[in-house]
Amino acid sequence: MKGTNGGIQLQLYQDGYANHDPITVYATQDGTFSAVLFDGPYKLVTKDKNGPWVNNRDTIYVEVKGKTQCEVKVTPYFTISDENITLDNNIVSGTCNIQQIVQDAKISQAMLLVSKTTFVDENTNIARQNLSNINPGVTNISLDI
């Protein structure tokens, strides 16, 4: 999931106040998000075409009281399982199984990214290998670092 540069955004609204601008919250790479808020009722609104899942504009009503959790349910186009990454000398190899969830979905891009930190994405990496013509099923990729 895109995790930097505001890749995935949600918007919080609290009615009853003069300022009706949204409070933008950003999802992290693992899909979590957080915000420091006053107690009270909020509307959590998904943005249009803003994620690697079936587009579904939604409003979730959340009553914030102390530490509050809410879940935003989505339908992914694909899921990935059986991930395995190995390093042999300078060769990083990755294998995974891609399962198609939405029948007419196409994989637009896939890549193997390497970083010196635990945080890695297409903007924060030291090496990358792009894949093209990707289909569901077992996928293998390697990169000489």
Predicted regions mapped to residue ranges:
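Structured interaction patches on ligand/partner-binding surfaces of diverse proteins
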Residues: 49-77
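Short, acidic Ser/Thr/Gly-rich low-complexity loop/linker segments typical of extracellular
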Residues: 15-30
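A short, amphipathic beta-strand motif
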Residues: 1-2, 31, 94
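A short, solvent-exposed beta-strand micro-motif common in secreted/extracellular proteins
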Residues: 31, 37-55
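Recognizes extended acidic, P/S/T-rich segments that occur
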Residues: 20-22, 113-144
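Short, ordered, surface-exposed loop/turn motifs in non-cytosolic proteins
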Residues: 2-18, 105-111
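Short edge beta-strand/loop segments characteristic of extracellular beta-sandwich folds
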Residues: 93-101
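Short strand-edge motifs at loop-to-beta-strand transitions and within beta-strands
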Residues: 31-35, 68-70, 137-143
